[in-house]
């Protein structure tokens, strides 16, 4: 058991609470980056490299027949083992987008190809569902059960927005627990069925789900209706072989009071290490537990925890995911350290000694942090071919700077003024910022102060402007002065722009005869005047 600090090399801002770690073909991938994908990695999926205490990300491309996979926070995902000629992959359901929209789609992510220089290409497909489908949600779990050669998925828990009939302007962004229903998804035909069990009376989210054969064990979780983390463990059995699934549920003791925890598998058996998470809203769970699934059920025993550092102990938030082989990645925000450029500090926790076999991680559980915090074409293959290279030499050669993600290659948003410190009491932090006005989406609203040489931009929220006043100032032509320069919304009127009118002389028509000018004598004029009178 060890705890090793990691240095994120120009990629620390991409990891956020609610991200997921996937394991395919011996590699680790990051899914659910912060914000929308940028030019350097349009897929939003990165390969994770840990070497010499450094954490690096490598952009991953997708095949031509792949669908778009948005970066989802707190989705439910489960690993698919190779079965009947189908490759290994991951099923991803639900989650929140960077625009705080909640998804209800089901995606299948598999490995499409691997180039000679270890470049990985993924394939993403959206699966169509019919029947009683699970609605949009996040913070839920997706588990794989199998019996007599047939497989099915179990969806349970999560949170979602209030129903459309109850959603108003005041509670537009309020979330509620999803009804305590269990959804069974037949992967072969995409048929869904919903089941209501008397043992499941309250909705729960950010729990753990561990599966073995046709059993699924739900550990811990948080309920908004109860406002605490009740100690509970449920076992769910799904009889999937014939006809409609027969679902049964039972309660187990001892139980666990935990939410947003990480489960990493140790060895080829169904043994898991539970670490991280929260016992209360403001209290982290510093203990570790060993969970073993066998024919008799589930056994939970305490396990020695690593020597947590002072940064981990005193920080209020942590997140991460399983990296397989008895190891996990933990990240903590750099709270109260404005001088440090890193947004997060990262650690690798290993529970397996060197030399022990690394088993396949058949059940993937990633961190689903309940606290809502809220780019160039894909890199092309190198033209250099590798012949007669050793595996370790090939791995070292792929660590070049050409295919490693670097934040310095992206556009510097600080130059645009969105995340600058506009005043001494600036309240906008790019790591914890949330929309304040209804017109805000991805960046804070700003207003221009006309004082000083050239003026400067300030955040509307820091200037304590109401939304109505902000709209009027943006639509009018009045000058604004920030609180440091008088705080007057309209002191002067912007002078209207003087547009010089252009004198356009008519073009002289060519080859055109003008009207005939007839000269009339005064006698003829008098004659015509008397004639018409």
Swiss-Prot record:
Compartments where located: Nucleus
Keywords (alphabetical) are: Chromatin regulator, DNA recombination, Metal-binding, Nucleus, Zinc, Zinc-finger
- Provide a GO biological process annotation: V(D)J recombination
Q: Where is this region: Disordered?
A: 358-413, 496-517
Against InterPro entries, the record matches this protein to: Gal_Oxase/kelch_b-propeller, Kelch-typ_b-propeller, RAG2, RAG2_PHD, Znf_FYVE_PHD
Protein known as? V(D)J recombination-activating protein 2
Basic and acidic residues composition bias: residue spans? 386-395
Summary of the function given for this chain in its UniProt record? Core component of the RAG complex, a multiprotein complex that mediates the DNA cleavage phase during V(D)J recombination. V(D)J recombination assembles a diverse repertoire of immunoglobulin and T-cell receptor genes in developing B and T lymphocytes through rearrangement of different V (variable), in some cases D (diversity), and J (joining) gene segments.
Sites binding Zn(2+) 2 sit at 449, 456, 482, 485
- Which GO MF terms are attached to this record? chromatin binding; histone H3K4me3 reader activity; phosphatidylinositol binding; phosphatidylinositol-3,4,5-trisphosphate binding; phosphatidylinositol-3,4-bisphosphate binding; phosphatidylinositol-3,5-bisphosphate binding; phosphatidylinositol-4,5-bisphosphate binding; sequence-specific DNA binding
Domain characteristics, as noted in the entry: The atypical PHD-type zinc finger recognizes and binds histone H3 trimethylated on 'Lys-4' (H3K4me3). The atypical PHD-type zinc finger also binds various phosphoinositides.
In the UniProt record, the gene name given for this protein reads rag2
Quaternary structure annotation from Swiss-Prot or TrEMBL: Component of the RAG complex composed of core components rag1 and rag2.
**A Pfam family hit:** RAG2_PHD
- Regions of compositional bias (Basic residues) in chain numbering: 505-517
Q: Where are the zinc fingers (PHD-type)?
A: 419-488
Organism from which the protein derives:
Oncorhynchus mykiss
Q: Which GO terms describe its cellular component?
A: DNA recombinase complex; nucleus
Q: Is the keyword Metal-binding in the record? A: yes
Does the keyword Isomerase feature in the UniProt annotation? no
> In what ranges is there compositional bias, type Acidic residues?
371-384, 396-413
Q: Which domain of life is it from?
A: Eukaryota
